[in-house]
């Protein structure tokens, strides 16, 4: 995660220098994750209201994210617990006979992060695991509020 959070200030500086408005929370889209090789390819993203165009040699690119269904897991607390949160999402997929989709993005959205509070217990990260589209499933998790997975 240290590499991820080193890159966010660079992206924010680009936004400031070019008067680009950010309309959402910072996020990471995981493009490729090689577990045996312990290598990950990812994109640092900030949401903007309209598409921009950058020069071909720019480190910054712009694109659109298509809608897809996903299992959402909310991690409250330090990022050191993210593996456990991801594992719970994958376990939920297995327990409910859902199937992971190869067309959606695996993402983390940093709803409340280190730039807003230095208290890790207050950090909120939303994890999205893409699944094959089905009708929305209403679920109720013990000691939680009801939610709809879309």
Q: Which residues fall in each region the model found?
A:
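A solvent-exposed interaction/effector surface
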Residues: 1-150
């Amino acid at each position: 995660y240290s590499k991820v959070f080193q890159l966010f200030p660079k992206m924010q500086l680009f936004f400031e220098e070019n008067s680009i408005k950010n309309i959402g929370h910072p996020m990471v889209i995981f493009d490729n994750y090689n577990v045996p090789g312990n290598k990950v390819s990812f994109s640092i993203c900030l949401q903007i209201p309209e598409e921009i165009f950058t020069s071909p040699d720019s480190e910054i690119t712009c694109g659109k994210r298509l809608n897809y269904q996903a299992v959402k897991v909310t991690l409250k607390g330090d990022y050191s617990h993210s593996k456990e949160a991801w594992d719970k999402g994958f376990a939920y997929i297995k327990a409910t006979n859902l199937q992971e989709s190869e067309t959606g993005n695996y993402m983390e959205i940093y709803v409340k992060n280190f730039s807003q509070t230095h208290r890790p217990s207050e950090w909120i990260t939303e994890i999205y695991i893409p699944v094959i589209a089905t009708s929305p499933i209403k679920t109720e998790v013990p000691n939680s509020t009801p939610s709809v997975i879309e």
